[in-house]
Amino acid sequence: MSLRDKAYSDLMRELWGSPDIWNTKKSYIEIAAKLGVDEETVRNRVKHLRDVGFLLGYRVVPNPTLLGRVFASLRIEFRDRESKQAAIPRLAQMDGVINIGSAYDTSLLVTVLADQDQDFPKLIVGLGVDGEVSLVPGLGLRTTSFRMTKLDWEIVRLLLRDAERKLNEIAKQLKVSTRTVKRRLNMMMKEGAIFTMPVVDLRKTEGISYQLRVQIEQGKKLEVEKSVVAKIGNVVFRASDSENGSVFGFTGANVAEGSDILEWVKQQPGVKSGSMTIAERVVQVFDWIESEVERRPKTMPVREPSPERKMQETIGIRR
């Protein structure tokens, strides 16, 4: 079965369909019930995604609010593909960058945990990157008021590159119980303090990975989204990038299919504009986020034990 089949697009949508469910833990039983199949079928399809090299794993990203930053997406247009490729390692050294998406043209889409008033064009020039920078409406990630503990940051640090590490291994390394690690992780997920993002190899999609952006007239969004999803059929990803903007990700068989869908979308009532990009690959970046998370526990003040705790310890010593 090809990854272009609706069975796989439906599965991927349930696993990681949009940023608002990145922090939602779903069991195979729940996914199976939603898709109308049995649990073993879901398990086998996920295994196939891994076996063909498409699903490489998952990474953890802390909510940018906890770092005093905001989620931002930059589109950088270059004069040619050569200058684009040369810019990727330089952009990977920029503070806040967590991944770099390359399209089959002369553009890059850079995901950044950015300072609130960041001057991106100036920052890019400072890196020696010659490209035209524009800010793409971000895919909304909810903020959080969760208060991270030192242990929380230590747990996150160990999951940044591999969100599927065994909890007992983490517990052993941090010298706490597995139950404690599980409890803290569940709490962080529930409060939106961390997000689990899929890591995929787009070259193994057995098709073309499209991203369709649509700007919609006021009050027509739900209607347009419904018709676009019905037209595409195998939507993997759907999200809002602004009040009247929507993004759809899907895998097509060829370039002609993508062109036909784009032309159809532009002609629909309520659609103001539409654009389509073909994703080539995604470069995962860890340097900045690892250093940022690693320093967090070191800068946290050591809390004095409460009077009650001191009394308990004193009594314990006397006994």
Region spans (language model):
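A compositional/biophysical signature of low hydrophobicity enriched in polar/charged and small residues
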Residues: 1-319
